[in-house]
Design a protein with these regions (language model features):
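Active-site nucleotide-donor binding segment shared across nucleotidyl transfer reactions
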Residues: 2-29, 33-39, 199
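Short, His- and charge-rich active-site/binding loops that engage polyanionic ligands
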Residues: 113-117
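Conserved catalytic core of two-metal-ion nucleotidyltransferases
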Residues: 1-2, 42-104, 123-223
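A short secondary-structure junction signal
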Residues: 106-111
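Charge-rich, low-complexity amphipathic helices
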Residues: 20-22, 35, 63, 67, ...
Length: 225
């Protein structure tokens, strides 16, 4: 309807190519969008969701802390471990990831990746009062949780707003590489692992997925290799 470019990604792409549907260990649907299409989608979806769906972002859900959007089905319940203590809105969902340019230059690329990780962590600390920490042993878990609480409380006491943090995150993730780019990735996931060539999404191919048709990149072989 709106001619937005999208493609299934990650485990959903693998399942589409190999099984024409879900793979047993993947319990969601992952969709990628070039940044310009993603931003248009966020605007359009606000008007199109109606009462059946909810577009979950940092802007629409004060308790949500992830950098990508979720399109949730209202009147359903599905609670992820990462969100169970956040008070965030639940429901069955599709993950929608923005893809941004990443530098062809190795040194600049590493700077982009480090900046994305840093600001993603800052966003999480600001948004999440009770972190999911429990894998390092009682003593270290206690120290890490205490540091998290101090940083979380400190940012709020200093009058830092969610809008300020979100703006800085967006600037970090969307900053254009200075040394040129023929590639894109999503900084909302394992960015280095999911780098793809722009040419791989120049043509999107319609393929069956369960009982619907979805789009995959023409370069899906290279992406999955």
């Amino acid at each position: 309807k709106y001619h937005l470019r999208y493609f299934v990604a990650f485990g959903t792409l693998l399942g589409t190519v190999r099984h024409k549907g879900f793979i047993p260990w993947d319990d969601d649907i992952d969709v990628g969008m070039p940044r310009e299409d993603y931003e248009r989608f966020l605007q359009i979806a606000q008007k199109e969701c109606g009462e059946e769906y909810f577009l979950q972002t940092v802007d629409t859900d004060p308790e949500y802390h992830l950098y990508f959007a979720k399109l949730r089905m209202n009147r359903t319940r599905f609670v992820e471990n990462s969100l169970q203590k956040s008070g965030s809105i639940t429901g069955f969902y599709i993950d929608i990831f923005p893809y941004d340019e990443i530098s062809d230059d190795e040194a600049e690329m590493e700077k982009q990746l480090n900046r994305a990780v840093r600001w993603g962590m800052i966003l999480s600390i600001y948004k999440v009062k009770e972190p999911q920490i429990g894998q390092y042993g009682p003593a270290k878990d206690f120290v890490m949780r205490s540091i998290w609480h101090i940083l979380h409380g400190g940012m709020h006491l200093c009058g830092i707003s969610a809008g300020m943090v979100w703006k800085k995150c967006n600037q970090a993730f969307m900053k254009k590489p200075e040394k040129g780019s023929s590639r894109i990735t999503t900084f909302a996931a394992d960015a280095k692992k999911w780098i793809i060539e722009k040419k791989e999404i120049e043509q999107l191919v319609d393929v069956p997925f369960e009982n619907i048709t979805v789009k995959i990149p023409c370069g899906y072989d290279a992406i999955l290799t």
